[in-house]
């Protein structure tokens, strides 16, 4: 179908007209007629003489008919007629009256036929005009703007699926840019065939199932991401707990050191720690005094134990690390008073001997402890 879009608005412009085209239907008063004659005289100063103004009397009426370029006047008195004829002969070919001037003169009532020209710059078709095609009776609407024309029509579609087939119409919009009129557009008469996806895209009537699927997918994504975040946080907390626990165990291990384990193996369950004095020189002096005092006391006791063991049986030699119970029992077995002087002399000799032999025993024990 061929659609021709043209303008429905026309511009009526003022046109110049001659006296032969003026049709008067009423007569004016005397003063109005005089003013009109004065207006005509100003248009054709070179053609109308001053005798026309002086010779006209108060009884002159407005011209009532116009034909073939000459103007006739009605005279009710005996005024000279030659002046009127002179006026008509000089005006017939030179006077033109603009329609704008006639609109200002209230003495005339004219029925003119305006000149009609089509507009070529702006399409002014009514905003919502519905036209009916004469060929296929298709309905379309035309909307206009400043530079465009919008045509809306119905397009037939045929949708086919496995179980159903149906036809329907959807509105289509075509935009035509304004150019030299007339604008031409052909509405397609063929039927467009498609499946349900096309129907869903055009109207959205069959997208309910797809919308639910999309919502289910979104819900699944949200739930999965939440569960994943929770599991990740739990794993991170567990790993951090293990790392902190291992560090604490390492710190506790380093405080006790290697000697703590050796002391545990030789039945020294407790490790005493003493605070170091603030003055390092006092620490050195205390260490020397403690070492000398303990060495003298140990040498005295060891010599006495060795002497008593040799005097009792001569087979077992008591040692501070071995046989302490036998040493204590043997020590209280000697109670006679006459042996005290002898024992004192023997103790002096044995103390010197034990002082010589003790360092070797301590070195041996320390070596065994390090091996253990």
Swiss-Prot record:
Broad class of the protein's primary localization: membrane
The alphabetical list of record keywords is:
Membrane, Phosphoprotein, Transmembrane, Transmembrane helix, Vacuole
The record's subcellular locations are: Vacuole membrane
PTM Phosphoserine: list the residues. 329
Provide the membrane topology annotation. Answer: Single-pass membrane protein
Name any GO cellular component annotation.
vacuolar membrane
**Transmembrane parts of this sequence:** 224-244
An additional note in the Swiss-Prot or TrEMBL entry is:
Present with 3360 molecules/cell in log phase SD medium.
Q: What is the designated name of this protein? A: Uncharacterized protein YDL211C
